[in-house]
Amino acid sequence: FHLENSHVLPAMIRKIHLAKCLNEGDWDAVRKDINLRPVEGVNGSNTDEEILEKLAKFGITPEAVTLWGTGKPMREFLWSEEMADASVHVLLNVDFKQTYDASKKNADGITEIRNCHINVGTGKEVSIREVAEKIMKEIGFKGELRWDASKPDGTLRKLTDVSKLHSLGWHHKVEIDEGIHRLYEWYLKGICINHQTV
């Protein structure tokens, strides 16, 4: 959930959560969050003005959240526990011979074992913009979503071919909306638990 170094979902969830708290004037929630994860040395003991200034540097204001790029890149998201589930499924249920085509032979008639890797994913992609909008809806932030096109988008498309995994009997179960809900609930729980011990 680091504002500079985390992956797409954690960064967007935290930014939108903080913007919602600011929008609603919930300074207690803002302070709980930044006490747990200070932002460049700024924590809950700083003044409102210092906190606002630091969060604005990361595109977080009471009125809007600004995210990098255009929001157009497409990404695939897999719930982490499902990565583990898919791995266990393959270990327990798949024989190595099922991972390659034995009918393919080289010029000497020898079976070549190639491309026997198994991609794990959902096989579904969603734009970063759509993900941000889903997060805003989940969190309940009523402010504006802005995009800073002067910042890089990164690779425009990242999608795995999961047809081999599907043919071996495993499919994901957690869709993006449910994953966002679960991750946000986990994030809030972490703030509450850690705030009680601080």
Language-model segments: what does each one mean?
Residues 12, 16-198:
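C-terminal substrate-binding subdomain of Rossmann-fold SDR/epimerase-dehydratase oxidoreductases
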Residues 1:
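Active-site loop immediately N-terminal to the catalytic Tyr-X3-Lys motif
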